[in-house]
A protein has these predicted regions:
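Conserved Radical SAM active-site core
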Residues: 1-129, 138-144, 160-165
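Auxiliary Fe-S-binding modules of radical SAM enzymes
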Residues: 1-8, 157, 162-230
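Structural preference for beta-strand elements that scaffold enzyme active sites
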Residues: 61-63, 92-94, 128-132, 148-152, ...
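Active-site beta-loop-alpha junctions enriched in small/polar residues
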Residues: 67-69, 98-100, 134-138, 154-158, ...
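Surface-exposed amphipathic alpha-helices with a cationic face
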Residues: 85-86, 111, 144-147, 193-202
Length: 230
């Protein structure tokens, strides 16, 4: 289990490295070029030895695909990770995808074969497993058809309007980091408008530290649904 600078979780555990999404701003690809987690970033690799990290007894909020996209995982990889999650309900688990339709199909298949997924991901009631969709543009927001626990709008690349019926319980918002050519510097009004939309739907907002200077006194970090009480 790795400590992380990601400010909305306690730690990361990556059982898969690599992602075929080919995002220009992908920090995972940059890290892979330096540390060589997998041979070809566009071809995800399975690291089953990392499953043992879930068995840590100290409760944590764990991001399980910071170096991949869970929607691109093979079915058997997802099932093995679900096994480890169900066996270790002391933690809270968070996953992000740009491919919610593919992930939904895999989860439906898993749920049809086992009842214990409801223990961590019930239709109603407290969850121990949280799924979010990563969006950065209006086109991506418009394409969402799935109900999820949160949107991660990082990096925010342009103004975004979320249909009121699609607004999730939580928005995580962040600016692009790094030094990519063409890096987008967000405008404060883009973030202000997302906050207004969230407030109208009684949704929480968590701004990443990358927005602190831009937002000034309007910087905001509401309590996260997966926060571990200490």
């Amino acid at each position: 289990m790795n400590k992380t600078k990601i400010d909305w979780c306690d730690a990361t555990v990556n059982c898969v490295y690599g992602c075929p999404n080919n995002c220009e701003y992908c920090y995972g690809n940059v890290l892979n070029k330096r540390f060589h987690f997998c041979k070809d970033w566009k071809v995800p690799e399975w690291k089953p030895e990392h499953l043992k990290a879930f068995y840590s007894r100290k409760p944590r909020s764990i991001f399980i695909d910071s170096m991949s996209d869970i929607g691109t995982w093979r079915q058997e990889w997802l099932e093995q990770v679900i096994d480890a999650i169900v066996a270790n309900q002391q933690h809270r688990y968070i996953a992000l995808t740009k491919r919610p339709d593919e992930l939904s199909k895999k989860l439906i298949s898993i749920k049809s074969k086992r009842d214990d997924l409801d223990d961590v991901y019930p239709l109603f009631g407290p969850r121990k497993l949280f799924f979010g969709i990563s969006i950065t543009t209006q086109a991506q927001a418009d394409s969402v058809r799935n109900s999820v626990d949160f949107y991660s709008i990082e990096p925010i690349l342009e103004p975004i309007v979320i249909d009121s019926y699609k607004m999730p319980p939580l928005l995580i918002i962040g600016a692009e980091t790094g030094n990519r050519k063409g890096k987008v510097i967000p405008k404060k009004e883009w973030v202000d408008d997302l906050v207004r939309q969230a407030d109208e739907r009684h949704s929480a907002v968590f701004m990443k530290e990358s927005l602190r200077q831009l937002m000034g006194d309007d910087f905001r970090q509401d309590k996260l649904p997966w926060a571990i009480e200490r």
